[in-house]
Amino acid sequence: YTSDANAEDYRANININAQLDAQTLINHGQGILDGYLSGQSDVDIALELNFTEQGFNYRAQVKSDLVGLTSKLPAPYKKAETQPWVLDAVVQGDDISNLITTQVNKQFYFNAILENGKSQFSNAHFIIGKQDLGLNSQDLSVTINLEQTELVPWVDLIDQIISAAQNEDDPESQGIMPPLNEIVANIGMLDFSSMVFNDFEMRLAPEQSNVYLKLNAKELRAGVFIPTSQRSQPIRFNADYLRVNFAEQIEAPITEAAKVAPDTDLTWLT
């Protein structure tokens, strides 16, 4: 702990060592990453407090190697307990609002604003990809930019984010996440139960208390209506274009060629 002061200003620097608990993080995040994240890890916090004639402001730098935490997310977001991942977060604010910026291993980013006196983030943005895209324009957005991945392992996480961001009628039941604005994905190659889609684009957004999903790829152009207000209603799928490529079919030319053995008798061809 260090501090300095003069007749007008006072500044304090405080270094804190704390422990990041995955379950506590999940609970405060309304269940997001439940079943994916576990364990505990030490974090170092460098807190700077400034009291000036113009008002109060602060800045907290949070760093950790996240050793002790385990991630069961799909690759490249899967992490063993002993594997180091760099966590670098900054929380800064004044007597009006607070800005949160977080990056994990330069693969995951979270940015949000929390106004003083409010219990819910605004302009929140989860980014899964290599580039930090900053704050969202409103509410909660999720951006997924990956070269290739499988769809099924991500479904539960997407459902957790949608559930956490649902805007309940009872204000007391609202959590820290704002209502969902959209989930946007751009994936070079998507594997959905061995069906392969190239240059895959997805946009999921609320529509009159339900969810509408727009899908585009080289092999697909479709819209999906998912009822959430009345779950007894059927899911409606409308496709303008669909061509199904299976992973086995893509590998077929190589596989068939490999079936020709070097010692095969081909004398009958001459």
Annotate the PLM regions.
Residues 5, 103-105:
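Central antiparallel beta-sheet cores of small beta-barrel/beta-sandwich binding domains
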